[in-house]
């Protein structure tokens, strides 16, 4: 499955969340990560985020898709995804 993670996290926790997500997904732009994951990886990511955030203050949205969507970037692409063959 392909996931897109979008988050709005308190300044005190944002670097920990970003560092954690960089281990699993591709950084796209501020507060957005995406990537192909297995179901087990998806569950690990959800559990890891759950341990890092404060549910009363922070917000994380995870979009689950069947495969990498076609996307169109308007303006500067901050961190292009390179296709590796």
From Swiss-Prot:
HAMAP family associated with the record: Cas2 (MF_01471)
InterPro entries in alphabetical order: CRISPR_associated_Cas2 (IPR021127), Virulence_VapD/CRISPR_Cas2 (IPR019199)
Record gene name: cas2
Top EC category: hydrolase
The keyword Magnesium is annotated on this UniProt entry: yes
Xref: CDD domains: Cas2_I_II_III (cd09725)
Gene3D superfamilies linked to this entry: 3.30.70.240
The entry's keywords: Antiviral defense, Endonuclease, Hydrolase, Magnesium, Metal-binding, Nuclease
Cofactor(s) of this protein: Mg(2+)
Organism domain of life: Archaea
EC number(s) recorded for this UniProt protein: 3.1.-.-
An annotated Gene Ontology molecular function: metal ion binding
Residues annotated as binding Mg(2+): 8
Biological process per Gene Ontology, one example term: maintenance of CRISPR repeat elements
Family assignment from sequence similarity: Belongs to the CRISPR-associated endoribonuclease Cas2 protein family.
Name this polypeptide is given: CRISPR-associated endoribonuclease Cas2
Biological function: CRISPR (clustered regularly interspaced short palindromic repeat), is an adaptive immune system that provides protection against mobile genetic elements (viruses, transposable elements and conjugative plasmids). CRISPR clusters contain sequences complementary to antecedent mobile elements and target invading nucleic acids. CRISPR clusters are transcribed and processed into CRISPR RNA (crRNA). Functions as a ssRNA-specific endoribonuclease. Involved in the integration of spacer DNA into the CRISPR cassette.
């Amino acid at each position: 499955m392909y996931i897109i993670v979008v988050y709005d996290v308190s300044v005190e926790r944002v670097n920990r969340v970003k560092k954690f997500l960089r281990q699993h997904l591709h950084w796209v732009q501020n507060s957005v990560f995406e990537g192909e994951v297995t179901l087990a990886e998806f569950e690990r990511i959800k559990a890891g985020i759950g341990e890092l955030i404060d549910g009363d203050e922070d917000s994380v949205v995870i979009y689950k898709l069947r495969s990498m969507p076609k996307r169109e970037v308007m303006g500067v692409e901050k961190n292009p995804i390179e296709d590796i063959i």
